[in-house]
């Protein structure tokens, strides 16, 4: 029994949801529009500003899709009404980031600058050279781009230098000790 799939999703004010016969869902809100095709094994219904999902059979794959479909719909509703934001912080001497047009340029201790193209559905801001803010309405796109930025230089467990999510607890290790 999927507890996530049985959640009733309340459609926020100012958000419209359109469901086609082929389970193609379009969600429009003040921040934009998201569209996604869902499996026909899960029935999506809209009644009185609430979205519900129901499985059409009890197969294992359908049970797995039930909770996933409900979670994806919840993320779509939140994305078009509030949006998603991930903040990253850069630690290290000489490590910094800047925006140049539609590109994010990161100096992360390499012999060269790392340049990333910013996707069209993601907005990136650099309030300080050591802070990066990734915003957007699509949770998957925001998380994927933030992960790509973090992958440039993961936090070092010995020194703590690198790019990490804001508030991320980095597991620190002790260095080598001198022998006696």
UniProtKB/Swiss-Prot annotation:
GO cellular component: cytosolic large ribosomal subunit
Region (Disordered) location: 158-180
Signal keyword on record: no
Gene Ontology MF: a single term: structural constituent of ribosome
GO biological process: cytoplasmic translation
Keywords attached to this entry: Ribonucleoprotein, Ribosomal protein, RNA-binding, rRNA-binding
Pfam family, one: Ribosomal_L6
InterPro entries reported in the protein's UniProt record: Ribosomal_uL6-like (IPR000702), Ribosomal_uL6-like_a/b-dom_sf (IPR036789), Ribosomal_uL6_a/b-dom (IPR020040), Ribosomal_uL6_bac-type (IPR019906)
Family membership: Belongs to the universal ribosomal protein uL6 family.
Record note on quaternary structure: Part of the 50S ribosomal subunit.
Function of the protein: This protein binds to the 23S rRNA, and is important in its secondary structure. It is located near the subunit interface in the base of the L7/L12 stalk, and near the tRNA binding site of the peptidyltransferase center.
PANTHER family: 60S/50S RIBOSOMAL PROTEIN L6/L9 (PTHR11655), LARGE RIBOSOMAL SUBUNIT PROTEIN UL6M (PTHR11655:SF14)
Name of protein: Large ribosomal subunit protein uL6
Lineage: Bacteria, Bacillati, Mycoplasmatota, Mycoplasmoidales, Metamycoplasmataceae
